Amino acid sequence: AATDTTADTAAEETQADNTADFDTSEYVNVLSREDGSGTRGAFIELFGIEEKDADGNKVDNTTDEAIITNSTSVMLTSVASDEYAIGYVSLGSLDDTVKAVDIDGAAASVENIKNGSYTIARPFNIATKGDVSEAAQDFINYIMSAEGQAVITDTGYIGSDDAAAFESNGAAGKVKVSGSSSV
């Protein structure tokens, strides 16, 4: 594979410049998502920040000093604008304004998540309230098809490599979709 050595050199120079200017005596500004965020839920679970109290109830031990953001875009902008900030977003939301943290020496990448070396990952789920309309089922079938998985992959998320081709059930209608701001 070809490499963009100009971009690599610029990234190395930027990293060197940032490292030289970074004052290790400064406090790190912790950013977190709002209560109810699926990204926050996954993060606190994966990192052991969520524990159970004596009664078995889940307790979120995110620091009280965390700056709370209400969306992925606000998280990215906030981290990008503060060299002492740290936060979290889904892999597909990463852009060149922030740098992902390596976990146990593994970079955040589709390949490393698929091979298990980057262990901080979560699935996205489709949830419905009971039975769905034929149009909604057709939409779900599309998402789970090779064509739908290609859209997922093309947008930076991890799709399935073994999905079958989409076969419409011929339904028409309106489907209401809501959920994570990560997708």
What is each stretch, according to the model?
Residues 1-183:
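Exported/periplasmic ABC-transporter solute-binding proteins
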